[in-house]
Amino acid sequence: MLVKSYSAAVNGMEVTTVTIEVSIVPGVMYHFTGLGDEAVKESRNRIAAALQCNGYLFPRKDTTVNMAPADLRKEGSSFDLPLAMALLAADEKIDGTNLASYMMVGELGLDGRLQPVKGALPIAIRARAEHFKGLIVPKANEREAAVVNNLEVYGMENIMQVISFITGQQHFSPMVIDTRKEFYEQQYNFDLDYADVKGQENVKRALEVAAAGGHNLIMIGPPGSGKSMMAKRLPSILPPLSLAESLETTQIHSVAGKLSKNSSLISQRPFRSPHHTISEAALVGGGINPMPGEISLAHNGILFADELPEFSKHTLEVLRQPLEDRVITISRAKYSVEYPCNFQFIASMNPCPCGYYGDPTHRCVCTPGQIQKYMNKISGPLLDRIDIQCEITPVPFKDISQTAPGEPSATIRERVIAARQIQEQRYKDIKGIHCNAQMTERMIHQYAEPDADSVEVLRSAMERLSLSARAYSRILKVARTIADLDGSEKVQLPHIAEAIGYRQLDRGDWAERGMYS
């Protein structure tokens, strides 16, 4: 007897419907075809144990299993459930009439319990596109899958519940989530706020400019000056995620298996802060079965690299291409996968190996050569992709002792959103450009060209401060954002002057002059 059930294979962000065909005829052999990996081939043992534990026997006949399309590699244990159901139906132990109406995924434990799988959300999207009546998933995956409208999603605890449901012996209600309500309720629930930060007004301003224009930023300052504290509060002033951005971001986390059983849509921009010992594969993605790395988990959010020079130089260099292209391709011998990685890069670092170069309250023991060597751990091409370079001074006692709260994140966020709306209107007809940080050279000349007085000041600053040539475009991009925050149609002298102040590391004499001179 021939029976079909349906599942899905996830490769990168792409999902393909998999048809599982089971044929049982007299005999004793078990045959598997369909390019499955080791976990798929081992499913026979898991299924046999799960069935026996629940009163069924694995078919003792000539059994042929095929997973189509045969040229598509199938990976993981998510095919256990649909294969087990097809085996039972083909062996005439259950009525399999309804199998064709549902897509199924789930790993079977030896006792028949359903274990969570990766990629339930993109699988649900595929099931809806293929016009299945519903999707059956492990209970732990039901909330993330249920965000897909116009699809019945059933979360099951074990294989016996699935059998009862498919055969019509027991009624189950599909999981229902008010996606929009949950999304908007959680959108502004931030635990951290800039009102908690004492002093550091110049750094807050730099972070506001970075948020308004989508600019990458690096903070340089001694230990304890508040670099990490400031960075962790940046999501609270960023424009909120749109539903489309949230769905895309949640899919990536679903594929990576990073969603909890209580998760539905991710409602706030991701903030990822990998340790400096992270490997290249963990940062950009990879592995035997390529999975998203930290840069993709930070998609539509922030990637924060604390103590940047402590990262492996080779690991840092692999960031250059994703920062430019906003997508990462991971290639293997017979296939490749692609993950989006449109993130805002925020970094922090000490000014020298001992950490106290230029600190008025501590003595630095580093030589200029040691400082320069420390700074050279960050390559020019990587630094070229960071628009704002902000120095942080230790907070004076008079600021620490203040009892009045600082400006709240909500107030700053209003200004950021207003500036972003100006940019969205400006670039509405340009594909792939949404904020000032993404402007091309041609667009810089079109939208950020300074007036005559500003050009002269910029020329003078580049000569006097030994600014590098690559700083020119970055200054104009940042100046355009500052003008947007001011509601100014033209880039004017004050905007250029402030933007010049954000290019500290481009100064040729950085290691020789004092940091705060």
Which residues does each PLM region occupy?
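The Walker A (P-loop) glycine that initiates the GxxxxGKT/S ATP-binding motif of P-loop NTPases
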Residues: 221, 285, 307
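Walker B catalytic acidic pair
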Residues: 300, 306-307, 318
